């Protein structure tokens, strides 16, 4: 079981060089991938930003959304994560706190490309940063 955040999924789905390292980590074991429902919105927002800056074409972004929909992800409701996420507010954004809370609840590693998240205090999640 692995929790994957939007930064890692976006790299994976866009098949970037960093995404290749994410893929190697995610698929080295036969693990299930778990995410909060928030991941879909965050990936789409990331794609929007990349399209606006010209880094990704609208057509490629549309394909990536289809790939996201097809990816076998176990999506979790925010309801069970909200209380713990709130306690993390001093050190982690509400968005990141959803992933951290889920990783803690499942006792699973959180795979991310967000380096600062790994050094944020106040949580017990095992965070694996892919660089």
Regions of interest found by a model, annotated:
Residues 45-52, 105:
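Short glycine/serine- and small hydrophobic-enriched flexible loop segments
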Residues 71-113:
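Active-site neighborhoods of divalent-metal-dependent phosphate/nucleic-acid chemistry enzymes
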Residues 1-38, 50-63, 122:
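Short, well-structured N-terminal submotif of metal-dependent ribonuclease cores
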Residues 1, 100-131:
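Acidic, PIN/NYN-like endoribonuclease modules and their adjacent C-terminal/linker elements
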Residues 21, 42, 84, 119-120:
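Phosphate- and divalent-cation-binding pockets in alpha/beta enzyme and binding domains
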């Amino acid at each position: 079981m692995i929790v994957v955040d939007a930064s890692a999924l976006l790299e994976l789905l866009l098949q970037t060089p960093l995404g290749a390292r994410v893929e190697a980590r995610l698929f080295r074991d036969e693990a299930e991938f778990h995410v909060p429902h928030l991941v879909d919105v965050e990936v789409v927002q990331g794609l929007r930003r990349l399209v606006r800056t010209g880094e990704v074409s609208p057509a490629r972004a549309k394909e990536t959304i289809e790939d996201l929909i097809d990816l076998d992800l176990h999506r979790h409701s925010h309801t069970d994560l909200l209380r713990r996420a709130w306690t993390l507010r001093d050190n982690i954004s509400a968005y990141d706190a959803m992933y951290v809370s889920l990783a803690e609840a499942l006792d699973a590693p959180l795979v991310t490309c967000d380096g600062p998240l790994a050094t944020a205090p106040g949580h017990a999640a095992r965070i694996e940063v892919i660089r």
